[in-house]
């Protein structure tokens, strides 16, 4: 028979973290500060493993504790509070990476210059595209820019933006 052992200190620390999460769920901000002090090094190290820069890891760290504070009441005490916190950090880091891949940071003035430089885009098409860009969502703008301006194929856009090809 195989037994898994958990050290007394690990068990005790999990209980302390669960107690802090319970207090946070009741609005205790000092409990959030204590949780942060006890777990920040581990969360930051994990965020650094996923982030491209230390600044991004810091952002994930701070966003993680904001999310912990706002959703502490949803934590189900099962002896794994660090796993719950790390899952929040992982999801936030992934969202940040997706968003960074989707950012193209092209201003409206630059959009006109891009279209003007594309000889295969007529002036009528240019006006139509500029008008469309003003009413499209950010995701839709990125799709149009990648396809109409950069000539990227739909399946490549889908992979780049982590979307189904049918959405593109």
Language model segments and positions:
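Short, charged helix-capping/linker segments at alpha-helix termini
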Residues: 6-11, 25-34, 44-63, 165
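Short amphipathic alpha-helical boundary/capping segments
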Residues: 19-24, 128-136
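Short helix-capping/turn signature of helix-turn-helix
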Residues: 37-41, 49-52, 145-152, 162
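Helix-turn-helix DNA-binding module
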Residues: 55, 134, 138-142, 150-167
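Short alpha-helical "packing" element that flanks the helix-turn-helix/winged-helix DNA-binding module
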Residues: 129, 143-144
């Amino acid at each position: 028979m195989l037994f898994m052992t958990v050290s007394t200190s690990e068990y005790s620390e999990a209980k302390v973290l669960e107690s802090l999460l319970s207090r946070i769920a009741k609005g205790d901000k000092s409990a959030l500060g204590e949780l942060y002090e006890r777990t920040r090094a581990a969360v930051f190290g994990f965020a650094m493993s996923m982030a491209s820069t230390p600044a991004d890891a810091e952002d994930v760290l701070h966003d993680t504790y904001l999310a912990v504070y706002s959703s502490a009441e949803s934590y189900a005490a099962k002896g794994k509070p660090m796993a719950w916190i790390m899952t929040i950090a992982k999801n936030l880091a992934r969202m940040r990476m997706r968003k960074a891949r989707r950012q193209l940071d092209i201003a409206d003035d630059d959009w006109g210059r891009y279209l003007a430089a594309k000889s295969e885009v007529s002036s009528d098409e240019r006006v139509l595209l500029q008008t469309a860009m003003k009413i499209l969502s950010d995701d839709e703008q990125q799709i149009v820019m990648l396809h109409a301006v950069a000539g990227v194929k739909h399946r490549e856009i889908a992979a780049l933006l982590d979307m189904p090809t049918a959405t593109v």
